[in-house]
Amino acid sequence: MMNMQNMMKQAQKLQKQMEQKQADLAAMQFTGKSAQDLVTATFTGDKKLVGIDFKEAVVDPEDVETLQDMTTQAINDALTQIDEATKKTLGAFAGKLPF
């Protein structure tokens, strides 16, 4: 019985630590960039879009497709950074579970 109580206490402790790491991650910002940094997209760690910036050189009414492609590239870059940071930050908890 005592062993089960210890496991529960350890699990609760890990849960609190994980919640803190999730909050820390959510407070961080990640900026994805397109080729030549012509488009940047900034997200919080919980994947909320904070802003998109376009360099003047990429804004061409005759070539909207390039702007769309660069925007997609910047967004995907930022989301990949968030996913990698999440795995690095929260993945460590998987090996610490008491069961």
Curated annotation (Swiss-Prot):
Primary location group: cytoplasm
Origin: domain of life: Bacteria
GO cellular component labels: bacterial nucleoid; cytosol
Location(s) in or outside the cell: Cytoplasm, Nucleoid
Tagged with keyword Lipid biosynthesis: no
Alphabetical keyword list: Cytoplasm, DNA-binding
GO terms assigned for molecular function: DNA binding
DNA-binding among keywords: yes
Family: Belongs to the YbaB/EbfC family.
Protein purpose: Binds to DNA and alters its conformation. May be involved in regulation of gene expression, nucleoid organization and DNA protection.
NCBIfam families linked to this entry: DNA_YbaB_EbfC
Subunit record text: Homodimer.
HAMAP family in the record: DNA_YbaB_EbfC
Protein name: Nucleoid-associated protein MGAS2096_Spy1605
Organism encoding this protein: Streptococcus pyogenes serotype M12 (strain MGAS2096)
